[in-house]
């Protein structure tokens, strides 16, 4: 009984169209940032190292190298703070979680491009 009500409420809130992407893909996430009284979009571009598919609670982690320092950010897929997600490049990987990239740097951290 309660489960159906929760599923219905979650389905109503999951209206945002999210492009299909997988770990290894390079994505650009446009995030809404509020500075004082104005709001702007900030782009966060990096490699998806993990994805969690849980309906409304879905999330994904993006890793990028900024000024020689690795930066990871986890985004809730259906968050109102995430404006848009665009896939820049498809990566060819054999694992679902790419946490091993944290220990790699430079050319060793490159991911082959998927040829479709």
Swiss-Prot record:
It comes from the Bacteria. The keyword Ribonucleoprotein applies. Transmembrane segments: none annotated. One of its GO terms (cellular component) is cytosolic large ribosomal subunit. GO terms for biological process: translation. GO terms for molecular function: structural constituent of ribosome. It holds the Pfam family Ribosomal_L19. Keywords: Ribonucleoprotein, Ribosomal protein. Disulfide bonds: none annotated. InterPro entries: Ribosomal_bL19 (IPR001857), Ribosomal_bL19_CS (IPR018257), Ribosomal_bL19_sf (IPR038657), Translation_prot_SH3-like_sf (IPR008991). Gene3D superfamilies: 2.30.30.790. NCBIfam families: rplS_bact (TIGR01024). Belongs to the bacterial ribosomal protein bL19 family. This protein is located at the 30S-50S ribosomal subunit interface and may play a role in the structure and function of the aminoacyl-tRNA binding site. This is Large ribosomal subunit protein bL19. It comes from Stutzerimonas stutzeri (strain A1501). The gene is rplS.
């Amino acid at each position: 009984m309660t489960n159906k009500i929760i599923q219905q409420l979650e389905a109503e809130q999951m209206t945002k169209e999210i492009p299909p992407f997988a770990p290894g893909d390079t994505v650009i996430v446009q995030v809404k940032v509020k500075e004082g009284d104005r709001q702007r979009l900030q782009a966060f571009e990096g490699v998806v190292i993990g994805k969690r598919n849980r309906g409304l609670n879905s999330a994904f982690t993006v890793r990028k190298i900024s000024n020689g320092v690795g930066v990871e950010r986890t985004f809730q897929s259906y968050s109102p703070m995430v404006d848009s997600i665009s896939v820049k490049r498809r990566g060819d990987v054999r694992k679902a979680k790419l946490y091993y990239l944290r220990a790699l740097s430079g050319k060793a951290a490159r991911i082959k491009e998927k040829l479709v």
